[in-house]
Amino acid sequence: MDLIKHYINGEDIEGGSRQGDVYNPAIGEVISKVTLGDLELVNNAIESSKKVLEKWRYTTPAKRASIMFNYKKLLEDNSARIAEMVSKEHGKTIEDAKGSLQRGIEVVEYACGIPNLLKGEYSNQVGSGIDTFSMKQELGICAGITPFNFPVMIPLWMFPLATACGNAFILKPSERDPSSSIELVRLFEEAGAPPGLVNVVNGDKEVVDALIEHREVPVSYTHLRAHETD
């Protein structure tokens, strides 16, 4: 049976002592196993991203935009294959999976305009002898915790814009359908992104807690309102 591993620094990593089942909902059978990460693996992924970030944050917006254009083309060229991966692990129809992927690609297209989006502002004489200006700077390492129901759309809402703005990214997809999310990152590297800029850590609550509690990592996630007070 296939084992779905973490994807860190451009490599498949098996880290973590536990595994979970990945089902094909159409037949109700386990089709693969997924490695579940732990605190140590999360910290290793963050350290990997730190090393890449030191160079990436100084990469010009024009160069980042070039990678985004390449990435958009790769996503479009591989849309049928990605949709099949989503359908196999999630249960969406192929057409529904293609539709959700397209909504993600639209965000990548928006990220292609990052040189213009990152422009600051300057105002003359806002007060007597006072001029003001603003600069947009990266946050550093960001993380995204994404849900089962949209394994490609929501990751594409997160990491392309985050990296286009000069950040590195840790992606924690749902452990129930992780394959298509990992494939998004493989294609991102094929488009020209450096290995380790986006790392994928599979896992459950242990990984989620490690990311949320890490002081250096701002987290974006999709959740139920009740989770806000859990």
Predicted regions and their residues:
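Terminal low-complexity tails and localization/encapsulation signals of metabolic enzymes
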Residues: 1-33, 66, 120-146
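Glycine-rich loop-to-alpha-helix module at the N-terminal edge of alpha/beta enzyme cores
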Residues: 28-118
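Glycine-/small-residue-rich active-site loops that bind phosphorylated ligands and cofactors
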Residues: 74, 93, 150-151, 176-177, ...
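Conserved small-residue-rich beta-alpha loop and adjacent elements
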Residues: 121-195
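A structured beta-alpha segment of the ubiquitous adenosine-cofactor-binding alpha/beta core
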Residues: 131-132, 200-218
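Periplasmic-binding protein-like
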Residues: 160, 218-221
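Single conserved hydrophobic/aromatic residue that forms the stacking wall/gate
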Residues: 223-230
